[in-house]
Amino acid sequence: GHSKSDKRVYRSVEEEKKWKEKDPLTAYERKLYMDRNTIRELRSKVREFVDTEFNRAFEKKDEVLTLEETKEYVYGTAPDIKVHKSGMHPSTYRLAIREALSEILRDEKATLIGEDVGKYGGCFGVTGPLYNEFSENILETPVSEEAFTGVAVGEGIMGERVIEEIMYGDFLTLASDGLVNHAAKIRYMSAGQLSCPMVIRAPIGSGTGHGSQHTQSLEGMFLNIPGLKIVAPSDPFTAKALLKSAYE
């Protein structure tokens, strides 16, 4: 079992011992081009680092956060972003969002990730020709919202800037573990040491004729999750401004 209170119903002590002998770390050491002394020294440094961090964490385990500190660790500080209305022109939601993505993807750290967002141009044609210009910044994925949301969360924690597209808002239910239990909580659980600045874009609601599993408005499910921010643009200008603001 996986619990610390495991009663060894599934495995005996003897079986556990046999598996410990197959420890992948030990097995991998045999393949390294290092002598035994170098490996021991490396192990010692890693163990010292882990012990130091472990003890440091336990020294703080009884500290009680104030309400202000709690808020600080749930949400990062948002920059003051000025939006200029110069150069206005007629547009649609599709074109406005594409403009925003085109400007965002000029950032070398930006990655657009999702199903059919590349050569296909997006399920609703939003990404369109962007793949021709930003193929290195666009990652097309298999049809598994849970999997590629996990990739996006991991990238965000590692410092990359991810814009994830969920084909239909209904499929946020499949991505909810990564969003609710990891992306939304990592800053708080690490006391501000880690963060996950990612953006998810998903079409919500009916009107596409694709049935009950593709036309729901599920944003209310996520409204009460600390660490998540939800925006719903009411016009093309706001759609572009909010997407860029969310990224920045």
Predicted segment positions?
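Glycine/aspartate-rich loop-and-adjacent alpha/beta segment that forms the canonical ThDP
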Residues: 1-83
